Amino acid sequence: MKIGILAIQGSIVEHKNMLERLGVETVLVKKPEHLEIIDGIILPGGESTTFFTILENRLLFDALREKLVNGLPAMGTCAGLILLSSRIENHPDQKTLKVLDITVSRNAYGRQRESFSTYVKIPVIGDREYECIFIRAPQIVEIGRNVKVHATFNDRPIFVEENNILGLTFHPELTDDPRIHEYFLKRCSG
């Protein structure tokens, strides 16, 4: 199995290290042709506006969207979640991939200095609580009827799934706990 990591900016190395720890081959996705050799893709955290600009400059936006619409499993964390979303609150004209039926609010959990971590129960990955690290995190403010909510914090979804797409407002790659990545890998192997 080969998992792509959208290699534009953000926590690329941390996702790569986690996947390699799990014995998975990674591909740093920088060009549309890289999408042809992967079984799933991670869209890491970073700065969401930069993502959109670089994706379009590298002709990756349309190719990635087509792959996702046709079933390529994806996991978006933080800014990656924003990229996957259908709508951005207060930014209705900002382009997104529109493959996850949610509305997000950017940086809703505060600025960099207000970043935090907390432990949350996520039943789909086991009984033990999971450390969720929020860094300038988006908030999911609305979900479509086919979106499953796997975890919440303060009554807001923080981990959702719709068809082949997983979306997280937090950073699982910044922990030593591989369970979120393992859950994603199960989605990639059918």
From Swiss-Prot:
Catalytic reaction annotation: aldehydo-D-ribose 5-phosphate + D-glyceraldehyde 3-phosphate + L-glutamine = pyridoxal 5'-phosphate + L-glutamate + phosphate + 3 H2O + H(+); L-glutamine + H2O = L-glutamate + NH4(+)
BP terms from Gene Ontology: glutamine catabolic process; pyridoxal phosphate biosynthetic process; pyridoxine metabolic process
EC number: 4.3.3.6, 3.5.1.2
A GO term, aspect molecular function: pyridoxal 5'-phosphate synthase (glutamine hydrolysing) activity
SUPFAM superfamilies referenced in this protein's UniProt entry, alphabetically: Class I glutamine amidotransferase-like
Active-site residues per Swiss-Prot or TrEMBL entry: C78 (nucleophile), H171 (charge relay system), E173 (charge relay system)
InterPro entries found in the cross-reference section: Class_I_gatase-like (IPR029062), PdxT/SNO (IPR002161), PdxT/SNO_CS (IPR021196)
Hydrolase among keywords: yes
Claim: Lyase is one of the keywords in the record: yes
Record family assignment: Belongs to the glutaminase PdxT/SNO family.
Physiological role: Catalyzes the hydrolysis of glutamine to glutamate and ammonia as part of the biosynthesis of pyridoxal 5'-phosphate. The resulting ammonia molecule is channeled to the active site of PdxS.
Name of the molecule in the record: Pyridoxal 5'-phosphate synthase subunit PdxT
